[in-house]
Amino acid sequence: SKFLKSDMTEAGYINTLMEQLALSHPEISFKYIQNRQVKLSSSGNYSVKDVIYSVYGREIAKALLEVSYENDFMKIEGFVGKPEISRGNRTFENYYINGRYVKNKIITKAIEDGYKGLVMQHKFPFVSLRIEMDGNDLDVNVHPAKREVRFARETEVYTAIYETVRKVLTHRE
């Protein structure tokens, strides 16, 4: 029927979902096989960097800078890509709040502002960030799929992410 998406489109959605699950749960071993071909395999060894290698390949994995930040209400860990691996769209901007893959304009802006002047215009960075925060500071019920979130302390969230990204990019040799 005309309402069914093509097999390729569906496979693309599944592939993306598997990548998001593997990246947000490096402690779990995933193997995704499509048409007898292994599309994704992760070891479950707790290493986000190894999952990034499995999903995105060596070129990306080699160009990562590790970030770690903590304040009284949030913790940020993960990797930001060196500016030279930026891309023409936002598909490489992945971040997880309390283990859940989400989208949020404030986080996206903080990340991209952190790269200002370091990537060309209309280029977007590679990031894989795990953000942990208290549930009281977070509203996940904005969207039925819980993909969008809102924060009680938007300014503090922006500042923490911006400074974490900016610092690692500008203080490297």
Q: Across the structure, where does each feature detected by a protein language model lie?
A:
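N-terminal phosphate-binding caps/lids of nucleotide- and nucleic-acid-binding domains
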Residues: 1-173
